[in-house]
Amino acid sequence: MSVGFIGAGQLAYALARGFTAAGILSAHKIIASSPEMNLPTVSALRKMGVNLTRSNKETVKHSDVLFLAVKPHIIPFILDEIGADVQARHIVVSCAAGVTISSVEKKLMAFQPAPKVIRCMTNTPVVVQEGATVYATGTHALVEDGQLLEQLMSSVGFCTEVEEDLIDAVTGLSGSGPAYAFMALDALADGGVKMGLPRRLAIQLGAQALLGAAKMLLDSEQHPCQLKDNVCSPGGATIHALHFLESGGFRSLLINAVEASCIRTRELQSMADQEKISPAALKKTLLDRVKLESPTVSTLTPSSPGKLLTRSLALGGKKD
């Protein structure tokens, strides 16, 4: 079995490194394509011994399981490019947030009647074999195809099959989850530094606390609240800290973060499906939108091309 990645960014690197570290694939059985060969992830893949190419078609030709590891809005253009090269042996795995099985199948069915498509959502901890992955199989994918993907992804962490309509929510929870954890760790380390700990020690202690807590939960059948209560002694430091978190809306912030990620996932698919614009045009549209929405807009004045004119928007006529 050979595995191909269209896209050689963080996800492709994390999966390739995870697969090779787990021993389920050797590097020479992996190929990745990217139009840009100077990316840090491309350099890292090259050092691992992964085959690299600028040609997406070449990646399809030399793979059996094909991961679409690019941004959602690029998927339609990739499928138009490689559709004629996808054969009956290929299992096409879309890892792009919000991209539905039906949208991939519709594109590929212009080239062949029964493309085998699987939608997958994973996360970057696959790089250390601690990923969280769910997948849903398409109309023409066989049971064996799903089992093959599950075998691959289980080698780099937890993997299970779900109904496709759950995957957007999974994206908001575990797909984006590592970023929430890293932000929390950064804040915890800042707290430790504020109270006198060296930065390196503060980071290590915070990371180990989260790692240990996660392992305790996964190894037990107890509810997180019960494990939390076990840490709190009456009138102690921990319950006072938790009261402070509650008063700051800690739970609501996390719930809202999961919801925001899920909603954005659906927006990304809508942008690709409805606007039908090229990746370059989409990038320009987003940049223009950022400029319009930014509270500070910088432009070059016609009379002074070398000078920067900054217009600050004041709220209610007041200045900060």
From Swiss-Prot:
Catalytic activity: L-proline + NADP(+) = (S)-1-pyrroline-5-carboxylate + NADPH + 2 H(+); L-proline + NAD(+) = (S)-1-pyrroline-5-carboxylate + NADH + 2 H(+)
Keywords: Acetylation, Amino-acid biosynthesis, Cytoplasm, Disease variant, Leukodystrophy, Mitochondrion, NADP, Oxidoreductase, Phosphoprotein, Proline biosynthesis
Keyword Mitochondrion in record: yes
Effect of residue 251 to C: In HLD10; mild decrease of homodimerization; does not affect mitochondrial localization
Chief localization: cytoplasm
Entry's EC annotation: 1.5.1.2
Residues binding NADP(+), per UniProt: 6-11, 34, 56, 69-72, 95-97
Composition bias, Low complexity: 295-305
Tissue: Detected in erythrocytes (at protein level). Expressed in fetal brain.
Family according to the record: Belongs to the pyrroline-5-carboxylate reductase family.
PANTHER family assigned to the protein according to its UniProt record, in alphabetical order: PYRROLINE-5-CARBOXYLATE REDUCTASE, PYRROLINE-5-CARBOXYLATE REDUCTASE 2
Disease entry from the Swiss-Prot or TrEMBL record: Leukodystrophy, hypomyelinating, 10: An autosomal recessive neurologic disorder characterized by postnatal microcephaly, severely delayed psychomotor development, hypomyelination, and reduced cerebral white-matter volume.
Name the record gives this protein: Pyrroline-5-carboxylate reductase 2
Chain's gene name: PYCR2
